[in-house]
Amino acid sequence: MTKGILGKKVGMTQIFTESGEFIPVTVIEATPNVVLQVKTVETDGYEAVQVGFDDKREVLSNKPAKGHVAKANTAPKRFIREFKNIEGLEVGAELSVEQFEAGDVVDVTGTSKGKGFQGVIKRHGQSRGPMAHGSRYHRRPGSMGPVAPNRVFKNKRLAGRMGGNRVTVQNLEIVQVIPEKNVILVKGNVPGAKKSLITIKSAVKAAK
């Protein structure tokens, strides 16, 4: 069965194991998520559990949103997402960090930091041209392709907007779970800025 929870990225730090090993970790705060709806094949065409995370003021919600969360007897939520392959939950139930344990392997999804309009060197990692005085280019994208088609092919790597994409990092290890603080420590870095929404769920490609 899949485990899943929504949280917010707090930042990065490091911890030391009992053997003295140094581990860089990302701190993710995941207050209890509330189950707002249980979707079934009969009513919705697929099975999923809809959860809400992070309370917001009622004045910021419209009537349909208030009525939706009222079925779960909870406050309006800022973020609402779905998890599949989660069974045995009813509307109003809570998902907490206690479902995870140290050593679990998870996939972490977030929105990468936006970098604005960037060139091909920063955006795609291309090499720059010769920097000598007589060089005809330094940081330009290079050849646009052969003469024959008289056009630029699709997917040609060019300058453009960078970042702000939905990114999933797979097979990250949970180093520690702190239930009293609703905190999960994940080994390594995860996409997104501080305070951004993070989705944690069981890894789909974990070694069995």
Curated annotation (Swiss-Prot):
Keyword annotations: Ribonucleoprotein, Ribosomal protein, RNA-binding, rRNA-binding
Example of a GO MF term: rRNA binding
Tagged with keyword tRNA-binding: no
Pfam family, one: Ribosomal_L3
GO BP annotation list: translation
InterPro entries xref list: Ribosomal_uL3, Ribosomal_uL3_bac/org-type, Ribosomal_uL3_CS, Transl_B-barrel_sf
Keyword Transport attributed: no
Recorded GO CC terms: cytosolic large ribosomal subunit
Region entry Disordered, spans: 116-148
Family classification: Belongs to the universal ribosomal protein uL3 family.
Subunit structure: Part of the 50S ribosomal subunit. Forms a cluster with proteins L14 and L19.
PANTHER family, alphabetized: 50S RIBOSOMAL PROTEIN L3 (PTHR11229), LARGE RIBOSOMAL SUBUNIT PROTEIN UL3C (PTHR11229:SF16)
Protein name in the entry: Large ribosomal subunit protein uL3
